[in-house]
Swiss-Prot record:
Expressed in tuft cells. The keyword Hydrolase does not apply. In the N-terminus possesses a conserved OCA domain for bivalent binding to class II POU domain-containing transcription factors and to an octamer DNA motif (5'-ATGAAAT-3'). This is POU Class 2 homeobox-associating factor 3. InterPro entries: OCA (IPR047571), OCAT2 (IPR043265). It comes from Mus musculus. Disulfide bonds: none annotated. One of its GO terms (molecular function) is DNA binding. The lineage of its organism: Eukaryota, Metazoa, Chordata, Craniata, Vertebrata.
Length: 253
C-alpha cells in the first residue's frame, strides 16, 4: 500500500510540471506581445531625457569659442572613448590659441637667419677660390679637387719602380724585411744600405721557396737581434751559401 501513493504522487507531480510549463509559455507569449506593444509606445519617452541630457548638459559649462559644438559628446557614449575625445578637445583648443604666437615669432625670426646663412656660404667658398673667378658648381668642384688630383700619382712611380730588366731596380722594390737576410752569409762588407748583387737577387727571388724553412730555423731566429754589418757567419753557413749561389747562377744561365 505504501508504494502506490509514491507512484501516484510521482506521476501527478510530472503532470503538474508539464501543465505549469505550458501555462508559463502561454503566459509569456501573451505578455511578450503586450510588452512589445507597450514598449513601442513608451520607449521614446524613456530615451529622450537621456539623449537630451547628453546634448544640453555641456552648454552651460562650456566656455569655449562658438566653433566648438556639443556634437562630439553625442558619439562619446562609452567610458573608454571619453579620454580620447577629451584629448582631441585639448589639442584643438591648444592649436587655435597657443600655437599662433610661436608661429608668428618664428616667421619673424626666420628671415633674419636664412639670409645670413645664404650669404655666408658663398663667402666661405669664395675665400678658397681665386679672386675674380666665378662661383658656379664647376669652379667649386675644381677647387675641391685640387687638394687631391690623380695626375700627381705618376710622379712617384719613377722613384719606386724603374725599368723591369735591371736587377737593382727589382731589388729596390722588394720589402726590407726580407732584404737583410740576403747579406748574412759570406758578404759581411755589405751593410744594410748597400745594393745587392745579381746572385743575391736570384737567391731572394727564385731560391727562397726551396730553403725558406732552413733559413727561418737556423739563421733568422738565432741571429735576429744582431746587426747585419757586425755579423760573422760560421764556416758551415758560408759553404751552404756558396752552394746556393752557384745554383742560383745556374738558374740565370
Amino acid at each position: 500500500m505504501s508504494e502506490k501513493p509514491k507512484v501516484y504522487q510521482g506521476v501527478r507531480v510530472k503532470m503538474t510540471v508539464k501543465e505549469l510549463l505550458q501555462q508559463r509559455r502561454a503566459h509569456q507569449a501573451t505578455s511578450g506581445a503586450n510588452l512589445s506593444g507597450s514598449s513601442g509606445l513608451h520607449l521614446p519617452d524613456t530615451t529622450m531625457p537621456s539623449s537630451a541630457g547628453l546634448y544640453f548638459e555641456p552648454e552651460p559649462t562650456s566656455s569655449t569659442p562658438s566653433y566648438f559644438q556639443t556634437r562630439e559628446f553625442s558619439t562619446c557614449v562609452s567610458c573608454e572613448e571619453i579620454p580620447s575625445c577629451l584629448d582631441q578637445i585639448f589639442e584643438s583648443y591648444l592649436q587655435t590659441d597657443t600655437l599662433p604666437e610661436p608661429l608668428l615669432n618664428s616667421a619673424q625670426i626666420a628671415p633674419h637667419y636664412f639670409p645670413e646663412s645664404c650669404q655666408v656660404a658663398p663667402f666661405c667658398h669664395n675665400q678658397s677660390l681665386i679672386p675674380g673667378s666665378p662661383s658656379d658648381s664647376s669652379s667649386l668642384s675644381g677647387s675641391f679637387d685640387c687638394s687631391y688630383s690623380p695626375t700627381q700619382l705618376p710622379s712617384y712611380t719613377p722613384e719606386n719602380y724603374s725599368s723591369p730588366p735591371s736587377l737593382d731596380s727589382l731589388h729596390s722594390s722588394l720589402p726590407e724585411e726580407g732584404y737583410f737576410c740576403q747579406h748574412w752569409p759570406s758578404h759581411p762588407q755589405y751593410n744594410h744600405s748597400s745594393p745587392a748583387t745579381p746572385s743575391s737577387v736570384c737567391y731572394y727571388a727564385s731560391c727562397e721557396a726551396e730553403h725558406l724553412d732552413a733559413l727561418r730555423t737556423t739563421e733568422f731566429f738565432s741571429y735576429s737581434g744582431m746587426d747585419c754589418a757586425d755579423f760573422a757567419p760560421p764556416v758551415a753557413t758560408t759553404g751552404d751559401f756558396y752552394k746556393r749561389e752557384t745554383s742560383c747562377d745556374a738558374c740565370y744561365s
